[in-house]
Each structure stands twice: as C-alpha cells, then as structure tokens.
C-alpha cells in the first residue's frame, strides 16, 4: 500500500510531462557543467603531477615504456619514495607485498602465494598497469607468455600477471637507480626461453 503509493508519487515527479522536457534539459545542462568543471580540475591535478614527477631524476625515462603513463609513474614514486634507499628491486617487491610465501604445514607442501604484507596501493598500481601492458606492449606480452608456458613451474593467469609486475619493478628500479634508457630488447633477452634451456 504505502510503499507503492510513494513509488507512484516519485515516478510522477520524475516523469516527463509538459514540464518534464524543461527539467530534463536543465538536468542535462547541469551535468555537462559539472563534467566540464571536473575536466578543468583533472587538468590542474595532472599539471601538478607532471611538475612533481619531472623533479625525480630519470622519471621521464619510465614514460618511454609503452603502456606506462604519468599516473602510474606518479603513483609508483609516491608509494616507493626515494629509490636510493633500496639496494635491490626485491626490496620494492617486498614493500609491495609481492614476495612469495608457501602455505604448508608439517610434511605437506602447499601452494605458493604472495604475502600481501606490503603496500596495498602499490600492488594495485602495478596490477592495474600490467593488464593493459600485457595486451598492448609486445615485450611484456612475451614476458607474460613465457611465465605461462615455461616447462618448469608454469604460472596461471594472476600468478603470471604478478610475475610480470615484478619484472616491471626491476625495470623501473634499474632505470631510476642507474639512469639507463628503457631497452625492450634487453627485456626480451632476459627471458630464459625453454628451447634454449633444453638445448
């Protein structure tokens, strides 16, 4: 009874009648104005991000990697901080909570999984950038395919994405720490192919 009556009253207020067209146009105009205001805010935030990213030595070189954008670089740098405080990329993996742990008890050897003890936002940034990179970046697609098809210990979907993300951490670390340019061929050569290992 009462709920149905309330629903009918709300439907009547939102229905497009004689005045409905005017209300709909006004609502659409307000939504467009709000959208334009958000675009301007986004441009301002992006400009500040860009200014801050350029202050970090060699950060601009990370943007030469296909699929890595300003937001990814800014997010990575804000979570990791000064790269000089790390002695190896494994420390960044640990910071992200991407080091492997084995779930076992007694004589039983369980599945390995990531610890998730580190920074959740850093893990999220890496995971979000890896999905499109695996699709659109040829060398990272090869890295992913290697992890899923290698003869010894092939990884499944999410595990392979995490392993490729760890590879991206190593690339970021090397570029930021040593100031080298990104080299897709070097990344490809780092993949130990099953055929060459068997030969």
For each feature predicted by the language model, list its residue ranges.
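Phosphate-backbone recognition surface of nucleic-acid-processing proteins
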Residues: 61-64, 70-157
